[in-house]
């Protein structure tokens, strides 16, 4: 028997690559992974449910403890004139009991599902009181049955001006800024859009607490209340009023400090301590004899700037302080000196003397005056002591080198 053999062949490893078996194995692996993901998700849900149940139980315990507390808190309103409400024992002695929850011991669970047990609370006598101090001298004592605490933040009016003779008196200014989100216009818009008025929580988040209305229609929650003393309550329609009041207050303080320093330095115009209110009480004849407290205003407007350390700077609205005209570089005797210029020179010399005597008051005078019939402004800066006093004309002609300042407007 003649047996034929084929040509030699090679066994490829791909013969053992069963594709159907591989696909079947991949399907089983996918099902196993899906089942594992489902089991893990169920376990996570069970853990979250258990923690949520614990949180609910603790929340119920806290609510139960809070509901069992009795509102037995003493509030004493203390004023400057301490008037005892009763001649016997004080009011705080009768209300010295406050309930404090004791930590309840949680019982061990016997089964998986168990009804939430209510925590046991115990009360302990604890002496506790809240003291609220008031700066108002005319504090009306309300009866204890109708005593009602209002949570309101009021802006205190600044203290009055100190007299000119006491230079060591410390001036204190309380500045309260009104945010734009709590103005009357926004409150009115909010009221017109919604039936309920502005609540105290919305205003308190902006830095103010509105006063609660009294009965029915007396709703003043949309207006900002300002405590100006003496039981007078004013409403601020906008923050511009507050900024104006602050600016006027700073201006009055700076003027009083300037007058006080000039009077202390020995300027004859400022030695008398007559205030504008006292000048108004005088007759016109005596008022004409008394020298004015403030120098006459020059033709060029002067701005008054007050920094944080009460340093006063008189800044002209004109940008250039050095004049290039021939009147400054030339002789002084060519043109007649204007009386306002003479007054400015005296004021400048007084300011420099004040700077030497009281270094804590930083007075910088940077003025521009228009002389009589002069088109160009005259930059006037007279140093108190000249290095080489050879000629007074050179001293007057050379202006003082002051740091350039920007406009305030």
From Swiss-Prot:
Q: What is this protein called?
A: Protein a6
What's an example Gene Ontology biological process for this entry? Answer: embryonic development via the syncytial blastoderm
Phosphoserine: which positions carry it?
A: 86, 134
Q: Where is the composition biased (Polar residues)?
A: 142-155
Per UniProt, the keywords (alphabetical) are: Phosphoprotein
Where Phosphothreonine occurs, the residues are 133
Q: Where is the composition biased (Basic residues)?
A: 106-120
Q: Which organism is it from?
A: Drosophila melanogaster (Fruit fly)
Q: Where is this region: Disordered?
A: 106-165
